[in-house]
C-alpha cells in the first residue's frame, strides 16, 4: 500500500476529528481546507463520513448557544439570521443550520 495514501488517510481523519471537536468547524470548511492541502477527495469523503451526525449537530447547537449570548439584533428574525450566517461561515451546511436555528429560543 502506498505510504502517502496511509498518511493522508490518517491525517484526514485526525484533521476532521480535531476541527469538529476543538475548532467547531463544519463539514464545508473542513472539506475546503483538506482539498487545499492536496488530500484526495475519496479520502476526504471517507474521513468526513466517520463523523457522528448527532454529535456534530450537538456541537453546532453548543456553538450557536455561545454565540447567541453576544449577538445584538433588533428582532428575533435578525438574531437568527446572524446566528445562521455565523454558523455557515464556520462551514456548517445551510439546511442543518436553518433547522437548528429555527428551533432556537432567542
Positions of predicted regions on the chain:
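An alpha-helical, amphipathic repeat domain used for nucleic-acid recognition
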Residues: 1-106
